[in-house]
């Protein structure tokens, strides 16, 4: 609050103004008033009040100048008798107002004396797409430029094209646990507990549902119309290989080589092989399986046994020549065994709490970037760090961090912001946008999942 005292020195014919104090000598006090220094609009405020008090000995005549189209005032002029006050309502029109904090001024004239009030406005625009579902698993087809994810509530496949904000869906009969998209982006297979569902992403329909003798923690759709199901349970188990060309007696597995339950699998770019990252065992390793004859047959594992951390998951480079592991180790891969799964560097993903794991990774060769979701520490479940970390895909050096839009929850006062916890990140085919699937961390919202589209 500022108090303005304007007075006349009778010895000379000039005027003076001072805030919160009076000059000496004081002979004839004429105009004295008080107004706030500033008016600050929170995200939820649209109307605030300014009180103008006449604390002098004569009436005050005033007018207000406002040139900002986003600011409206209830009156632009008035008169205040001695000892009285006037209230003026200031309103904010947030249409076309950009996101963030902006400032403007209202200019006052009190009995020909100028003054001003700073107007501050905090504006929040919901730029992310709030989902009407949760997110269990997700993949992105750069061939079709579309994001595909499965949800439990409701049980469905969800499809979002890169240039659209409309999500198309395919209802499912069983609770989904994982999804794999075909390399051509035409079809996908969804894993369940005891079943898998083969879907057509073009017609948004179910092709067929098949029985499977396990709970699917991960699944891979081959180019041969086989589905490879990785079991969640039983420490030593087998990859269930489902020949979807057959309606019955279509489950096979390699009787010789077992895997550890919880293994995560992905098919390489050639479509001939699947790599699998073991979980629940130390040291964790990566196995290679040949699927050219349908059934997945283990042919060998990496030459390292505890030399480098793999930590149970991995992602391919776009050209299919490298693997980036959850433990930040980078490996070269090849169809030649002596050149396959060979150490090729480490991503120095240092976080404030120490060296964390990579929880998700996407590679854009056009940008020469790796987009990482990182966790802090080594505890389970992992604490995901809000933000997308960008690394150079050639030298593996850190470049920058992209901040994520928080979730805003209104309350009776100013509202609360919750961090956006990232789960999946994908770059589109042209490397112009990132799609980040986030969850409102600790908010407990009915709709706590969202997709953020970020220009890159």
Predicted regions and their residues:
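Short loop/turn segments that connect beta-strands within beta-propeller blades
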Residues: 161-165, 200-204, 243-247, 290-294, ...
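Blade-level signature of beta-propeller repeat domains, shared across WD40, Kelch, NHL, RCC1
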Residues: 415-456
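Surface-exposed binding patches on compact interaction domains or structured appendages
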Residues: 19-37, 55-89
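Repeated scaffold domains used in trafficking and secretory/extracellular systems
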Residues: 133-140, 174-181, 214-224, 255-271, ...
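Structural motif
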Residues: 155-158, 197-198, 235-242, 281-288, ...
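A short beta-strand micro-motif common to beta-rich folds, especially ectodomain repeats
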Residues: 50, 100-112
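A short beta-strand motif characteristic of beta-propeller blades
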Residues: 124-131, 165-171, 205-210, 248-258, ...
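Bacterial Sec-dependent N-terminal signal peptides
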Residues: 13-38, 111-125
């Amino acid at each position: 609050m500022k108090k303005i005292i304007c007075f006349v020195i009778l010895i000379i014919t000039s005027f003076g103004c001072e805030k919160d104090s009076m000059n000496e000598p004081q002979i004839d006090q004429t105009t004295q008033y008080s107004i706030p220094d500033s008016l600050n609009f929170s995200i939820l405020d649209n109307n605030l009040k300014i009180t103008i008090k006449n604390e002098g000995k004569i009436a005050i005549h005033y007018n207000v100048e406002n040139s900002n189209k986003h600011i409206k005032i209830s009156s632009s002029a008035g008169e205040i008798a001695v000892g009285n006050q006037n209230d003026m309502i200031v309103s904010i029109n947030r249409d076309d107002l950009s996101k963030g904090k902006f400032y403007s001024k209202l200019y006052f004239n009190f009995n020909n004396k100028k003054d001003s009030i700073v107007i501050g406005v905090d504006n929040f625009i919901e730029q992310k797409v709030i989902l009407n579902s949760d997110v269990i698993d997700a993949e992105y087809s750069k061939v079709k430029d579309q994001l595909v994810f499965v949800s439990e509530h409701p049980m469905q496949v969800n499809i979002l094209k890169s240039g659209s904000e409309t999500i198309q869906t395919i209802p499912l009969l069983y609770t989904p646990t994982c999804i794999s998209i075909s390399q051509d982006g035409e079809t996908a297979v969804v894993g369940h507990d005891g079943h898998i569902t083969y879907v057509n992403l073009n017609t948004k329909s179910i092709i067929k549902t098949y029985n499977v003798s396990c709970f699917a923690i991960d699944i891979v759709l081959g180019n041969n119309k086989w589905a490879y199901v990785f079991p969640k349970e039983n420490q030593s188990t087998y990859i269930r290989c489902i020949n979807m060309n057959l309606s019955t007696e279509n489950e096979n597995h390699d009787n010789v080589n077992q895997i550890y339950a919880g293994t995560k699998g992905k098919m390489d770019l050639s479509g001939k092989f699947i790599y699998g990252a073991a979980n629940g065992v130390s040291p964790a390793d990566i196995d290679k399986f040949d699927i050219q004859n349908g059934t997945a047959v283990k042919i060998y594992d990496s030459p390292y046994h505890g030399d480098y951390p793999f930590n149970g998951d991995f992602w391919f480079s776009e050209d299919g020549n490298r693997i980036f592991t959850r433990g930040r180790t980078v490996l070269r891969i090849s169809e030649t065994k002596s050149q396959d799964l060979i150490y090729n560097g480490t991503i120095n993903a240092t976080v404030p709490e120490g060296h964390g794991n990579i929880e998700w990774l996407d590679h854009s060769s056009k940008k020469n970037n790796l987009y990482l979701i990182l966790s802090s520490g080594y505890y389970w479940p992992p604490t995901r760090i809000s933000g997308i970390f960008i690394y150079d895909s050639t030298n593996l050096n850190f470049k920058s961090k992209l901040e994520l839009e928080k979730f805003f929850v209104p309350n009776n006062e100013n509202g609360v912001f919750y961090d956006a916890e990232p789960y999946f990140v994908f770059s589109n085919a042209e490397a112009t946008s990132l799609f980040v699937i986030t969850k409102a961390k600790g908010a407990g919202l009915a709709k706590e999942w969202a997709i953020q589209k970020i220009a890159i």
